[in-house]
Amino acid sequence: MGILTYDNLKVGNTPLLRLSNLENGELKIYAKLEWMNPFGSIKDRAAYWMIKIAEKEGLLSKDKKIIEPTSGNTGIALACISRALGYKFYAVVPQAITDETKILIKKLGGEVFETPDDLCPRFGKGTDQSIALAKSIVESYPDQYFMPNQYENEANFLAHYESTGPEIWKATEGKVTHLISGIGTGGTITGAGLYLKEQGNIEIIGVEPQKNHHIQGLRNFEESGIPPILSKRIKIIDRWIKVSDEEAFTAVRLAAEKEGLLIGPSSGAVLAAALKLNKEHIKGTAVLIFADDAVKYLGLYTKLGVLNSEQLDILRKLSNALSF
């Protein structure tokens, strides 16, 4: 690629893949493979837009360091972009995220601060400590730090309104009838969802995990505060589908066995929701947001027995390629 600039950073335009082996009726199921973004997840979009707009508006300059609360993928994307553009990056993360995620952020030049938090709850009800810590640092040293704040930054919403939504509409030739997405900050489902609703009668479905879940990147809103990005446009969501850990990890296994896809836990939760929808004998075309693949979850999948030995061997080779 050469020197990284905003002009040659190819974020977006990820493919749609039909999951025909998982269809069971008249609902066509397509997955948007967001791990095909340059830094491996859907969060590349928000990170790219937040930094680009911050520089353009003069909120971020080379004398500042970037700090962000993240459950993983935004931190990875920001670490990559920060390193390429010459910024120092600090990720404030929940202790519960996978070791692979923490290691990768560090290998990309970022520093990691851990908090017990409900961004990926495993310790009971939290108080969004990662967000609170990052905000307190910025408030104490406003001349030294810039926090993109994916939970409130309109650039997060715009990234999906301007890219993800239009890509889905174009790729399906306007035939999409359902959008199914997990929710972390709410940027994806509100941005892509609003765009699609403006085009036609599209049902927007939000996926919510169980309490005390193990699905990195998603939120249970009985445990966690509703991010401002989501709260101001929450009515865009027509329906919520609850998914348990067992359902999500069963869907991860199905994706591997039936489609040869090694997907992350949040993608498994989204697939589980689609399979529930499929049982309702609905006609149409559903697009699922697969936020990332399984490469950062080798330890978790091994511990929980999510994949078989052959699948884990493939995943281990992918992880080794990233030097975890």
Model-derived regions, located:
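PLP-dependent amino-acid enzyme catalytic core
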Residues: 1-324
